[in-house]
Amino acid sequence: MAFRRTEGMSMIQALAMTVAEIPVFLYTTFGQSAFSQLRLTPGLRKVLFATALGTVALALAAHQLKRRRRKKKQVGPEMGGEHLGTVPLPILMARKVPSVKKGYSNRRVQSPSSKSNDTLSGISSIEPSKHSGSSHSLASMVVVNSSSPTAACSGPWETRGIEESVTTADGNAESLYMQGMELFEEALQKWEQALSVGQRGDSGSTPTPGDGLRNPETASEALSEPESQRKEFAEKLESLLHRAYHLQEEFGSTFPADSMLLDLERTLMLPLTEGSLRLRADDGDSLTSEDSFFSATELFESLQVGDYPIPLSRPAAAYEEALQLVKEGKVPCRTLRTELLGCYSDQDFLAKLHCVRQAFEGLLEDKSHQLFFGEVGRQMVTGLMTKAEKSPKGFLESYEEMLSYALRPETWATTRLELEGRGVVCMSFFDIVLDFILMDAFEDLENPPSSVLAVLRNRWLSDSFKETALATACWSVLKAKRRLLMVPDGFISHFYSVSEHVSPVLAFGFLGPKPQLSEVCAFFKHQIVQYLTDMFDLDNVRYTSVPALAEDILQLSRRRSEILLGYLGVPAASSIGLNGVLPRENGPPEALQ
């Protein structure tokens, strides 16, 4: 019998196996006859039995020790190579997040107050950390996340070295603040992504009612511990986002207030007066986003034209003179179109309005310009009616009658009385045609009566019936208004005659179900509004003098009319009015008396 040790076998196990082979060796060597002749004493039998039992116990103990040693070797590398991303879920859930100060960034973050009630009901209360986002708190986070003692010991020193290098490279506190804003913004994005991924996972793993009915025990197990942990983690993450949003609103609206206000004032070229300094002091005392919002509102409401000059890109002597008249309250107006025409303020609109009135007054002293504007209006409405597949014959007759009535000097006094009764404060082309007729018509079409909308939105009615009903409604309203006229045959009466042909077409175009006609009417309105916006823009026309402004308005009118008439398929009217005649579709030109 030789002592053998196989590969992969320990010394103790090999010895035990050798001892266990002794009885077999003796039996095979001396034979069964020798054992039959052998007489064992009771003491020897006890020794042999104890030896065999001890050998078996020793083999089992060696096997058990070997299994435990292998298990330790497998667990050791896993714990040593564990990273931050593999931290168990309970540790992540129990970990407290330090508060970080953050300002507003370029991306607008939605506040949790705008979310649903179900989302808000899942927010759990977490005690906020009393530590700031300094290097020490960051180092503590590194120690918690790291299982290596080397990393834990070197964390504070590495963080301190990074902080010193950043401070040396850029000692500006404002730039450091902006870097913190960017880092906190990245953290917000990661937290939002984690929350959205968790919500998608919960919705994707929601068991169906059929599964629960087929196997209730399996369904209850699926909704047990892992799902409750995920739900608790999502609630705490949502609470973290909720507090982060509040920090963002609080510190973003107060910390850089002075520098932001100074940049704003430099951009608008506004001087620092006592009023703005007082508002800045009030802003510095406020800590909530609501206070900051109202203080900003007060600031912009206080930026009046009378106190602060509007930045002018070019000299505008006529505009400055009109602005002085506005300060004295000498520029009346029926309706303020400040926002529609893109003006800085009501005073800015009134000053430009005064200049535009003077420019149109100078333009319409020329007979050819009168004919030009009259012909452009006629061709625009004719093109609209042609696009709507309506005959413009009745409109042309009523339009010529209104135009000839308006150009007679003996009718001007009566026309003034009629228009003053409608709120028109100045007898200018802008106030009568552009504002009273066109802009009021667009406003009426934006807010139609509910009865008209009910007919147009009825799916059971045909388009032809809707068009007929809408035209009947327009005629009924105009007929009722005509009965209340102060002058039965005056300017307003002629205007109503024109409206009887135009109003149904415009109303059905803007409100009706035909997309092609709606597109044409929308383009028509856009060109008119853009024409007025360009007219009230200091960069597009010259407000240096009234003649220069009149010349620019005329060129602007020609350009816009060419665009609109070209879209409607009508010949351009740029050359009309230069020879004092109106071209006719059939027959020779006819001079306008």
UniProtKB/Swiss-Prot annotation:
Amino acid composition bias (Low complexity), ranges on this chain: 124-134
Residues with PTM Phosphoserine? S132, S220, S224, S228, S276, S295
What is the recorded post-translational modification?
Phosphorylation at Ser-295 of the FFAT motif activates interaction with MOSPD2.
Q: Where is this motif: FFAT?
A: 292-298
Question: Which positions carry Phosphothreonine?
Answer: T206, T273
Q: Where are the transmembrane segments?
A: 11-31, 42-62, 563-583
Q: How does it sit in the membrane?
A: Multi-pass membrane protein
Renumbered to this chain, region (Disordered) spans 101-134, 195-228
> What does the domain comment read?
The FFAT motif is involved in the interaction with MOSPD2 and its phosphorylation regulates this interaction.
Family affiliation:
Belongs to the mitoguardin family.
> Quaternary structure?
Homodimer and heterodimer; forms heterodimers with MIGA1. Interacts with PLD6/MitoPLD. Interacts (via phosphorylated FFAT motif) with MOSPD2.
Protein name (Swiss-Prot/TrEMBL): Mitoguardin 2
